[in-house]
Amino acid sequence: MGMVSRTATTAALAAALILGGAPHAGARDGGAGAAGAGAGVAYSDTTGVGVHNAYEKSAYPYFTDALDSGAAMLELDVWTNVFGRSWRVSHSNPLGNDNNCVNAANADGLRTGPRDQDLGGCLASVRAWHDAHPGHRPVVLKIELKDGFQGKAGRGPAALDALLTARLGDALFRPADLVGGHPDLDAAVRAGGWPARDAMAGKFVVEIIPGTVEKDNPLDTLWTDREYAQHLRGLAAAGRLREASAFPAVLGAAAGDPRTRYADAGLRPWFVVFDGDASFYAGGGSVDTAWYARNGYLVVMTDAHKVAPAIDGVNPTEAQARERVALLAARHASVVSSDWRSLTSVLSSVVPRGGAGR
């Protein structure tokens, strides 16, 4: 179990077994599934389980199957370059769509019609599923912009907001919903700004991160995270923050406050979501993960299966997966991410963050 204390891990594991011992009633029907965590518990005081690249056909036949899994987070990869049309959803095809989305108009179409739709089609299916499952658990939709925004091609931050709003509308939990009367996101969460889980029922939180191609492009000097944070700051200054639909994440685990990487200190308060390698967060003293929980920041811990001792990334035993979730909950994960798509009893579990809440 690495350097995580046995006491903390045991406490979190016990909580996991109590709260997530079997699939909750909403694992297949989309119910909120948060009752075990306590109706009044803040969203930021719980740990859920997410699925990496849930849009791939090898993961689920249809994206609605991913939504039905009970997972707390589902990931989409999106391409924006000028050599293709629209916002493409694919892992490795930068020019077209390769995914399990069907552009459903309603619940009857969630498993019919052609797949390989663009982001708008994926979001249409999300909305159709949402309408068929009122009060469903809160779900993070993690969008990796593989090659970043392309504002000159009509695929910049404002265009993404418009698309998300057109497709998901009132199903979105927006930055403005969190900010309230505070000056920025950081001030809001430090004041206890995340609502209770039951108040988040029926909502989607959109997280956006820089993509692998973008990060490797020496000509791209304005990555997704910084570009969207600038967008948020500008909207807030203009009194139009309500138009924003997503939360930019600081990508990459690091000791201290990772936001210090942004030379423009005025951008830092617009980041309250952090996303990085689970092994680094679980490594012990180099990262004070309790700092994130104390301040109400969300932390997505990726590649959970690679934390020592490594377990299977797709088909571990249920006991192995539950123990891993408990270990990372003890390290203050908000979302534990891997490819455990068939373990619906684990995906639908909600445990106290830190083992016993913040």
PLM features: residue spans?
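Catalytic cores of phosphodiester-bond hydrolases, prominently lipid phosphodiesterases
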Residues: G33-R358
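Secretory targeting and sorting signals
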Residues: M1-R28
